[in-house]
C-alpha cells in the first residue's frame, strides 16, 4: 500500500466557460483603424505637452507617420468621448455650460487647440475646463494637475485671455472626481512660446527621445 505522502491529490476540475473568439475577433476587426499624425505647420497643445522635443519637431515638420490604431486603444478613445458627453450633460443640467470644444489659436508661433468646456463659474465668470480620465493608481497620487495637463490648460488660458481655469479628473475605475484650479501664468507661457520658437528654428530634430518610453518619436526612422 502506498504511503499517505505518495497519494496524489485529486484535481478538482474548474468549470471554465468557453471563449467566444469569433465575437471578440469581429469586434476588434471592426474597431481597428489608423491613428493619423498631427497636422503639420502648427503646434497643438496635446503635442507641446509632451516633453520630447524630438516628437514635437517631427509633428510640426510633418515627419510623424500614421500608425495602426489597435482596437483596445479605439475603445479608450471612445470612452473619452462618452466621458465628455456625460460631463457636458452635467454642466448643462447645472445651467452653467457656455460652450464645448472652443477653438483657440495663436498666430506667432502658430498654435491651435480646443478647450473642452467653457462654463459660467460662480466666482470667475467665463471659465475653461480641461477634462481628463485617469486610473486609480494615478488618481490616488494626484495632489495637483499632471505637468502635461497643466501645460495644456496654461496654453488655453493664455491664448484665450482667461485668468483661471480648472483641470477636472475622473477616476476611470470608480468615477470619483478631483478638480484643480490654475491661475494664468505668463512666465510659464513665455517658456512654452520660447520652446516653440526653438523647435521651429531647428533644421533637424534631436537625435534622442527625451520623453516617456511610449513616446511615438521612437517609431520614426530616418531622422
What are the residue ranges of the model-derived segments?
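Soluble or luminal CAZymes and related metallo-dependent hydrolases
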Residues: 79-83, 148, 188
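Metal-dependent nuclease catalytic cores that hydrolyze phosphodiester bonds in DNA/RNA
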Residues: 1-128, 135-141
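A structural signal for short, well-ordered beta-strand segments and their strand-loop junctions
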Residues: 99, 128-130, 164-169
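Metal-dependent nuclease catalytic regions and adjoining charged, substrate-binding loops involved
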Residues: 141-146, 159-223
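Short, histidine-centered active-site or binding-site loop motifs used for metal coordination
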Residues: 132-135, 171
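Short, glycine/acidic-rich beta->alpha junctions
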Residues: 109-110, 145-150
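Generic structural marker for isolated residues within well-ordered, non-membrane alpha-helices
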Residues: 153
